[in-house]
UniProtKB/Swiss-Prot annotation:
GO molecular function: protein homodimerization activity; zymogen binding
Tissue: Mammary gland specific. Secreted in milk.
Keyword ATP-binding included in the entry's annotation: no
One cellular component term from this protein's GO annotations in UniProt: extracellular space
Main subcellular location of this protein, as a coarse class: secreted
Leader sequence residues: 1-15
Compartment(s) of residence: Secreted
Function in brief: Important role in the capacity of milk to transport calcium phosphate.
Superkingdom classification of source: Eukaryota
The protein, known as: Alpha-S2-casein-like A
InterPro entries (alphabetical): Alpha-s2_casein, Casein_CS
Presence of keyword S-adenosyl-L-methionine: no
Amino acid sequence: MRFFVFTCLLAVALAKNGIEQRSASEEIVSFYQEKYKQDSNAAIYPTNQETPSVSSSEESVEVQTEKDEQIEEENVYLKQLKRIKQIFQKFYIPQYPEVYQQQIVMNPWKHVKTTTYPVPIPETTRIPLEEIVKKIVEMIKFNQLHQFVIPQYVQALQQRIAMNPWHHVTPFRSFPVLNF
């Protein structure tokens, strides 16, 4: 009982400590993020005091141009990815190094002569998903038809005790038993 109470108190204390550390670390992170934003704004953009006020329509135009630029960059990036994908689809790159079949020929002078012949790698063929599904269905039907059924007569047989010829039980005793 004491151990249970102790573990509960310890868990509560650790949870409070973790929450306090998280809140402190979150405050530090937010402070540095604000400081970074202020530094980056000061370095790149002048502060609001230095620039005259800009109307809301001009700000919305700037925001839209920035969004358009981001969309264009994303489109260019996607086009480049598509080109790279098309280039790699043209080339067949094997996943494993080529296997060479070695033939060993014994010379009469007890020297081993080895020759290597490249094993032809067949081109990969793509099988449609429908054919794969058909094959799976056929295999399931085949397995259902040819299931091995245990015959019922095997279960009905009684177990017999194996007899040992050295411990043969005789119906008659070799010595008389006296009952008083």
